[in-house]
Structures are given as C-alpha cells and as structure tokens.
Amino acid sequence: MKLQEKEVLLFDLDGTLVDSAPDLALAVNRTLKDLNKATFDQDTIHHWVGNGAKVLIERALSGSAIIDKELDETLTKDALTIFLAHYQQCLCIESVLYDDVQEGLLSLKAAGFRLAIITNKPAIFIQPILTGLGIDNLFELLIGGDTLADKKPHPAPLHYAMKQLNVVAEQCVMIGDSKNDILAAKAANIDSVGLTYGYNYGEDINQYGPQWCFDTFNELLISLKR
C-alpha cells in the first residue's frame, strides 16, 4: 500500500511534531539543582529524551544514557515528582513546532486523514502542549506513556489506538523520530515512517527498518499528498 493510501496517521510528539528538548532540559536542570546535583547542557539532555519521564530522570541522575543500576529508588521517585512539577510550569516556554507542522497537519486533516498521537510523554502534558502550540482539536485520540501499563516500543499503545479508532493495521502508519516508534510499529504489524531530524539517541533511524524515511516534515507531506 502506498503511503498516501493510509487512512490513519499515528504521530509521535517529541522530536516528531514538537522540538521540546529546550523545555525538557530546563525542567531537568531545575530538578538537578533542587537536588544539588550537577546540571547538563541541552545537547546532552537531548539524547536522553524518548523513553518517558522516568527514564529521562534516571538518565539525568546517572549523568549518562546508560542508567546506573545502583540508583537509589527513593531518590529517583523524589526526582521524578520534582521534575513533573517543574515541567508543568515550562511546557511551552521554548518548545516549538518543527517547520511545516502546523500547516501540514491542517492540510492532512482537510484531505481526510485521521490523526492521533502516541507518545511516551505523560498524558497530562499532551493537551496543554497541543493547545499552547496551536495544534489542538486536530487529533481524534491522544495516548501518553502512562495511558496504559506499557509504552512504546511495546505494541500495546498502537493496538489500543486501533481498537479505539476501529481500524486495522493496514489502514495505519506510525510516524516518529525514534527507534521506539519503529519497533512498536513492527511489533503491531503496522507500517512506519522514520523522521531523521528528531531525538533518536544519535542513531540512524534507517537501521531499524521503517518502510519510509524522510529528512523533513515537508518531505512527509509531499509523500502523503493525494
């Protein structure tokens, strides 16, 4: 099936539609300061994004993408609580939509595509970000990293989306910047689009085998044009 023949577009959020790294970095560093821990530059934190808030904080406390197995559980829990409070206050300070996203989503909706979001970000943050960046009311379904017991790369969020939207895998495509998006799609037998401009831990997303791969959102829009 050609990409433009798909009916449902399942979008990741961070690194796909929104460059949220600046605000995530701000919240992470505010958290680390509160805990009297060393802070990090935005580029470093950028590579820790994509597996949900808990993993992001574990990486920050470890000072590495590889989580310290000796991390104190109580410290991690406290740090996560502090981080979520800070992030709530800075969701859209520096976060921006990637080029062509707002106009592109409007055109896709007008063309008859059904749009949904499947992100590993806590669900409580999704709607405020969409509203703050002017792309609310475009999506039929919003699934966060804590909506279900499992998050990407587990296929459960994608299966849940199909059930809620009353569609089958062949009608859908998962669009994201991370290996988690591609692996989740494969596990759910859904085709996927890899976007190279996002937060894939410095890895080439092509190595995970998406059916399509684009360097810009506009290239995606061109391929979806009916």
From Swiss-Prot:
One of its GO terms (biological process) is DNA repair. PANTHER family: PHOSPHOGLYCOLATE PHOSPHATASE (PTHR43434:SF1). It comes from the Bacteria. Its EC number is 3.1.3.18. The keyword Metal-binding applies. Belongs to the HAD-like hydrolase superfamily. CbbY/CbbZ/Gph/YieH family. NCBIfam families: HAD-SF-IA-v1, HAD-SF-IA-v3, PGP_bact, PRK13222.1-2. Mg(2+) binds at residues 12, 14, 177. Keywords: Carbohydrate metabolism, Hydrolase, Magnesium, Metal-binding. GO terms for cellular component: cytosol. Specifically catalyzes the dephosphorylation of 2-phosphoglycolate. Is involved in the dissimilation of the intracellular 2-phosphoglycolate formed during the DNA repair of 3'-phosphoglycolate ends, a major class of DNA lesions induced by oxidative stress. This is Phosphoglycolate phosphatase. The active site is at residue 12. It holds the Pfam family HAD_2. It comes from Colwellia psychrerythraea (strain 34H / ATCC BAA-681) (Vibrio psychroerythus). One of its GO terms (molecular function) is metal ion binding.
